[in-house]
Amino acid sequence: MMGGQNVTWRTLLTWIAGVSLGFSTAGYADDRWTQAGEVLLYALPLTAATATYTLEDPDGRSQLVMAYGVTMSTSYVLKGLVERERPDGTDDLSFPSLSAASAFTSAAFIQRRYGWDAGLPAYLAASYVGWSKVYSDRHHTTDVLAGAALAWGVSQWLVEPGSASQFAVVPTEGGMALAFEVNF
């Protein structure tokens, strides 16, 4: 694309959702509500990472990797220490929710780095991921809240605020889309 044309996230998010759908094959993802949560679980970090490349933000990319690494490592350590049984009884690795930690790391990064116009939809998507884990009996509500709080705290610590002007929430025929502008 040449000239001041916009690159919208609608195409990007459609691609990410399609790729992510392939990851939602877990045995417990047996209904559409849970499957949608699985799609968003993978789409959020892919979206955050893609934004750092598309917006040519190498500092943000490094901060995303650090925040994700610290959040997930801490979550794994806590799982081993707490050993809380899942609501469905499958194992004792319920606390904290890695899914919530992953989704909320992405959302917190997007909000902190690119502002609330991009962050609010990301937080809504992350909240849906958390809700879907409680709905599917994979986690207790407190597991999800702990994963979300950990992710938010680590992101506040490691992610520097960036320019918020590159993102916008725009109406579409089917609802809303997250968009950003890149000039070539």
Range-by-range predicted roles:
Residues A43-T52:
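Hydrophobic core of alpha-helical transmembrane segments in multi-pass integral membrane proteins
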Residues A51-T71:
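Interfacial segments of alpha-helical transmembrane regions
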